[in-house]
């Protein structure tokens, strides 16, 4: 399955490194050197192999094999990057889920439908789900709030703490 794993938001330095704003979970695993990314560019699909990966100020910094200066990567700025995903290669602990499993789930506060998870971002302490309903809600993925997750039926039950909704 091919999945959008981020966007090249800028170049970094003059040696061909790019800043990626991730749209995926497990970035350190997804962006390991040797992994392959695809970029739709001018009606083609460019395939790039990751040469190096590091984090810097909440961004993921990548360099690609064969692209050794800023001129080689400048043209990809602003483009989404995709990867062939094999989620089954990553073993999850209990109460851990892939972003792709959570995004698209309908969230309920008891019986009341709140909305659909359309994005997830990391805060350091816990993930926060962006839920779009009659307005946008930010739901922390913490035990006190999230009571059950049913991936098969794309249904999440929360117990909203005061001020959350």
Swiss-Prot record:
Q: Which UniProt keywords apply?
A: Chaperone, Cytoplasm, Ribosome biogenesis, rRNA processing
- Tell where it localizes: Cytoplasm
Its predominant location is cytoplasm
SUPFAM superfamilies given for it? PRC-barrel domain (SSF50346), Translation proteins (SSF50447)
Note the InterPro entries from the entry.
Answer: PRC_barrel-like_sf, PRC_RimM, RimM, RimM_N, RimM_N_sf, Transl_B-barrel_sf
User: Sorted alphabetically, which Pfam families does this protein's record hold?
Assistant: PRC_RimM (PF24986), RimM (PF01782)
**Gene Ontology MF terms in the entry:** ribosome binding
The similarity annotation says: Belongs to the RimM family.
What does the record's free text say on domains?
The PRC barrel domain binds ribosomal protein uS19.
According to its UniProt entry, the function of this protein is described as: An accessory protein needed during the final step in the assembly of 30S ribosomal subunit, possibly for assembly of the head region. Essential for efficient processing of 16S rRNA. May be needed both before and after RbfA during the maturation of 16S rRNA. It has affinity for free ribosomal 30S subunits but not for 70S ribosomes.
HAMAP family listed in its UniProt record: Ribosome_mat_RimM
Entry-linked PANTHER family? RIBOSOME MATURATION FACTOR RIMM
On subunit structure and binding partners, the annotation says: Binds ribosomal protein uS19.
What is the protein name given in its UniProt record?
A: Ribosome maturation factor RimM
Which gene is transcribed and translated to give this protein? rimM
